[in-house]
């Protein structure tokens, strides 16, 4: 898996781990940490993000892949931000931008002309993605964010429609509380727009939804004190940081492997991970120093030092312990695990501040980093770690071809396989029947009801339950989580509407893609109910 684009020419996996961990230890002036970092990676406790694998400790590319720019309402500023995005993309970043500050189509501009509006400028960014390939590792990707009360919103929601000039961009809508409330209370115009959002998510999986007030109500204290607004997120909707015209947020990501939580929960693994990410940030700062187009990102990195340690392997951890994804036990574990990670990460940032000092923005706060946790999607990382489940998401199947950006791989759920071996059912016929049922085991008569619960797939799990679990987790995560929903096309739109309103009410900050895998009719109703509410 790693040979496909993440390693240097002729490099072995061991060589890459050596390169990365010694670079991290050097950045911290703590050569003694190299072995501890190596152990974390070799044991699979910490999963590195793709740009860290590809670029950390090398002369090429950047070890950070996540950027956002704030597009201002004047041509000079727009040109500069476009240049910034070109540079970020060329160096391997996934980029995003907030366009909400731009005036609407048709409004007056200084030379007596009329503005062509926010969406027309997005076409420039769309073209960049087509033109600039990222040193061969992966194609550029860009997400545009716009407020739902922006006058150009309807034009924006038709991006990616057949015949629309913009086809490469991903996009998200920023929705404030007042707007949601008006829409719920019956404002006709807002209902029309909301219906478009629901329809678009059902058909295209997009737009992402960014609940502006949920985000800003729960941002770190320093951002409240400095009056910094978080306007939009990144390409994967888990980053919650403020970009301005002068500063472009970047986020420094890697993840802890929850599948092995019981191995590392009583060690200093989380502390080491936070130290490691701070080192990655330091390398980013050094590599971008003096680069004209990365000045805003460099300034943000220095002043905020924002980190985003995430997790993967949550569903794997549950299955390993024969715990269903739905129900009280998984919710209680969510609380205990994430409060534990939060506490350790926070202490690590204090330790870093004590050793290396506080950055400019955090003088007097006793911390080295404005944020510490963010839960990214991790599809490739999960495969690198030997098929652990992605992020906080359930497995979408128990048996499938995994088509990742670096190729196709066949996989069987290893914990299910162990169970089938115990039952003398690990044979071609059983797996074939699972494949024909699209990766489900609900038809296997030899499994108990409890076992079937444990091996439910993403599309068979209540989406309300996924939202409730995410809202518990969100209390401990200072940024956000890449939260996908899997909603079958046949679910009535009023039920989908209820789910999204519930997500907003429960304080969810962002919703990522909406997938729609079909399930049987009986299944559909259970997708919007709550297991643990039934007692």
Task: Describe each region flagged by the PLM.
Residues 31-37, 94-97, 136-143, 284-298, ...:
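Flexible, glycine/charged-enriched surface loops at secondary-structure junctions
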Residues 1-34, 57, 111-124, 134-228, ...:
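Conserved, charged catalytic cores of large soluble enzymes
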Residues 230, 237-240, 287, 373-524, ...:
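Catalytic alpha/beta core of large soluble enzyme barrels
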């Amino acid at each position: 898996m790693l040979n496909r684009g993440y390693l240097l020419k002729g490099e072995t996996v061991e060589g890459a781990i050596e390169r990365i961990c010694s670079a991290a230890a050097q950045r911290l002036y703590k050569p003694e940490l190299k072995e501890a970092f190596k152990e974390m990676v070799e044991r699979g406790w910490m999963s590195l993000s793709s740009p860290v694998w590809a670029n950390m400790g090398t002369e090429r590319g950047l070890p950070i892949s996540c950027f956002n720019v704030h597009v201002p309402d004047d041509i000079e500023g727009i040109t500069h931000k476009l240049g910034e995005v070109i540079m970020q993309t060329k160096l391997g970043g996934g980029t995003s931008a907030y366009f909400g500050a731009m005036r609407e189509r048709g409004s007056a501009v200084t030379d007596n002309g009329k503005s062509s509006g926010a969406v027309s400028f997005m076409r420039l960014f769309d073209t960049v993605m087509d033109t600039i390939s990222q040193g061969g590792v992966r194609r550029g990707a860009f997400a545009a964010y716009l407020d739902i009360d922006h006058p150009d919103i309807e034009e924006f929601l038709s991006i990616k429609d057949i015949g629309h000039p913009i086809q490469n961009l991903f996009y998200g809508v920023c929705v404030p509380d007042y707007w949601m409330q008006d829409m719920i209370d019956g404002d006709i115009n807002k209902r029309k727009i909301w219906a478009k959002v629901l329809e678009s998510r059902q058909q295209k999986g997009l737009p992402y939804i960014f609940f502006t007030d949920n985000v800003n109500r729960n941002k770190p204290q320093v951002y409240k004190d400095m009056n910094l607004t978080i306007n939009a997120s990144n390409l994967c909707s888990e980053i919650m940081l403020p970009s301005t015209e002068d500063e472009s947020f970047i986020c420094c990501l890697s993840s802890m492997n929850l599948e092995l939580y019981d191995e590392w929960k009583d060690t200093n693994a989380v502390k080491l991970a936070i130290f490691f990410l701070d080192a990655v940030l330091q390398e980013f700062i050094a590599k971008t120093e003096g680069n004209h187009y990365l000045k805003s990102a460099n300034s943000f990195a220095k002043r905020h030092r924002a980190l985003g340690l995430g997790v993967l392997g949550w569903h794997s951890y549950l299955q390993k312990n024969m715990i269903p994804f739905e129900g009280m036990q998984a919710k209680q574990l969510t609380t205990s695990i994430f409060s534990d990670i939060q506490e350790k990460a926070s202490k690590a940032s204090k330790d870093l501040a004590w050793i290396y000092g506080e950055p400019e923005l955090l003088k007097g706060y006793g911390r080295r980093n404005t944020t510490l946790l963010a839960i990214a999607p991790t599809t490739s990382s999960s495969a690198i770690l030997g098929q652990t489940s992605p992020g906080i998401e359930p497995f979408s199947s128990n048996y499938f071809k995994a088509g990742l950006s670096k190729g196709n791989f066949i996989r069987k759920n290893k914990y299910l396989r162990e169970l089938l071996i115990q039952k003398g059912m690990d044979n071609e016929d059983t797996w074939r029947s699972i494949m024909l049922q699209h990766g489900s085991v609900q038809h296997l008569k030899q499994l108990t009801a409890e076992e079937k619960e444990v091996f439910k797939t993403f599309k068979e799990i209540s989406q309300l339950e996924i939202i409730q679990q995410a809202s518990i987790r969100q209390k401990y995560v200072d940024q956000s989580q890449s939260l996908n929903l899997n909603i079958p096309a046949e679910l009535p739109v009023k039920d989908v509407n209820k789910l999204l309103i519930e997500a907003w009410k429960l304080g969810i900050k962002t919703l990522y893609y909406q997938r729609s895998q079909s399930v049987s009719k009986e299944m559909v109703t259970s997708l919007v109910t709550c297991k643990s509410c039934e007692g």
